[in-house]
Amino acid sequence: MRSITYTLLVGMLACTCISQAEMRDWKDKQGRKIQAELVSCDGTTVSLKLRSGKTVPLPITKLCDEDQSFLNEQSSDIDSDNGDTGAGQLTPPNFAQPWPESIKTDENFEVKTIKEGPDQFIYESPHFKYISDAKLGLQLIRAMGRMFEATYDINKSLPIANKPTRDPQVKFPIFLFEKKSDYIAAGGPPDAAGVQITKGNDPTEPYGHVLVPFESLGVQKVGSGYRMDRAKDFHTLIHEVTHQLMGREVKQASWFTEGTAEYVGMTPYSNGRFALSNNRSSIVASVTAYGKGKENKGRALGKDINLPYSLEEFMNMDYASFTGNDGNTNYGIAPLLIYYFYHGDGTGDAAQIKAYIKALQKGTPEVEAQQLLLNKRTWAQLDDAISKFWRRAGITLKFAKKQVSQNE
């Protein structure tokens, strides 16, 4: 069932684009009134400007049903210039928002039981549906859901307009397995902590689903119930959930798809909080050594990295080659490129990669969209810029020179 909160969110975000705000009465669920005009909404809080000129914040869930309906009626078409279709279906893109320094998810989010037994147990948090083959308490679902909801929040907050996080009607399915053998039987890789699976154009799962064994969440059976190790390293699961939160139209290139997931997965996370302000050191540690976590999950490429392919070849590598014999290396190089385009290219405002993402969202082919990343540079010049950037962080990154055939 589509919740009124989601409907309100779409309406309010769309209302921020209205050219003329009007002074009107606003009422909360307790019947208290203020007269104000709508200023903006960040997705959780609406800003209202009082007659005095003071702007006050109000949680969107506190508004009365009448005001929620009013806001929904005010919703306008999503800006088609950003590649979105379906008026009112997606919240507006957030490309203009500042890069977040940290993300802390609300610990008081609602969890509820949808179905219990006999062989399937379904629970929900605000943005995820958990389908488990064993009964779990709501307290455990809340503890476990904190990581999933925080991953949703960071992907929504990155100013790259992740389309699935802007879809107010979706709950992302997470399948939980008490036994690792059942996880494998359902399609989970034996050596992976979890996996995201997309089933073609299945309308019931527009963004696929994630398979996770209990052990990857640090969930252990204790007596007749379960408990969770909150100190567990969730890098792989955060990586896979990030895949689920990326629109299909941007998943054309292996380097971008995997690099984006690794960028989020390598960002320091603890108890519902992502620290982005110092994630460069964490990414460097995860790529060059074994990371900063206690489980030693890093690529261990060292700080002198010589690659057998050119930058252009790497950024156009098919998925089979990307995950093949040099997979560990490729998974390490991809987040270095992502970090450069997010924070090191040009003035550090991510302008070129945002243009690239916008182009992909409009259906532009990958090779054509890459011209926006090049930004009138040759591949050699871009290679040099990336190498110089990482040299300042103590990493020597050397791509091979592209081999030009005699027929070219």
Q: What are the functions of these language-model segments?
A:
Residues 118-253, 365-369:
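Juxtacatalytic substrate-recognition/specificity segment
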Residues 46, 248, 269:
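Basic nucleic-acid-binding interfaces
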Residues 196-212, 232, 251-408:
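Acidic/His/Gly-enriched intrinsically disordered linker/tail segments
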Residues 23, 35-38, 64, 68, ...:
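Extracytoplasmic/secreted envelope proteins and their assembly/folding machinery
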Residues 1-5:
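Positively charged n-region of N-terminal signal peptides that target proteins for export
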Residues 51, 177-181, 343-345:
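Short, flexible beta-strand-to-coil junctions
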Residues 6-16:
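Bacterial N-terminal signal peptides
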Residues 18-124, 129, 139-142, 146-150, ...:
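Compositionally biased alpha-helical segments
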